[in-house]
Amino acid sequence: YKMQDKFHVERVAANSADVFTTVSEITAIEAEKILGRKPEVILNNGLTIRKFPTIEETSVKHLVSREQIRQFLTFYFFPYYTFELEHNLIYFIVGRYEFKNKGMDTLINALGKLNDSLKKKNSKRTISVFFWIPMENDGINMEILENKNYYMHIKNYVDFQSENILKKIVMDIVKSKTPNVNSLFTKEFLKDLEKDMIVFKRTGNPPISTHRIKNDDDPTIKGFREAGLNNCKDDKVKVILFPVYLTGNDGLLNLSYYDSMAGSHLGIFPSYYEPWG
């Protein structure tokens, strides 16, 4: 097909450039030995700390972003079954789609073992693991989009009635009464919610991807299956493949990368090769 391999292309590019740079001393040494040219300039990667929030601001952002992630988990999983969000940890991996180089295979295998271990212990703890890995897809899974719409309808309906419910709670308290369902909710309100919940509920298991993946033999999807990560009710480790960029306007999570990370508990980056870049 008259295509050159990556090494030849990189070597020619390095030796043809007017100025050759790398991002660290380690990659500079590698470039000199492998590509045959010593970089003239090293442009070290780094973070501008002043652009990032303080510890106090991060704590607040964690709570706000975590609540939005939990809302996503609610409409993603709860139509099929429920679990305690208070006992749920949020993990993530993010990066280019390089299945082995980024250690996705290692992570999936480890999550499979963790899932088995937590199930044997009958742990109350659950873990939701996001794979924020942009890849080719055919758009949002319509089932998930419907789940979100049904959930938002229920939430908005309750919010619309919340002022009246609050008044009843306050009145019961000042009258030294214990608030109960019959005094707080009207029959009409409960009947409407019952109808909404029937529509909201689904059978089967939640999808393992938010979007329709074109490749039926995708290694991540196959890896989930082989590791026993099927998002079944008894699985303690839940996986969510999120194959789009986190722009804050994706239609599901609607958080930026930094906000998504701030709302999580742990990021995992088991890269096979990472040249300090």
Give the positions of each predicted feature.
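Catalytic cores of nucleotide-sugar-dependent glycosyltransferases that transfer UDP/GDP/TDP-activated
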Residues: 1-277
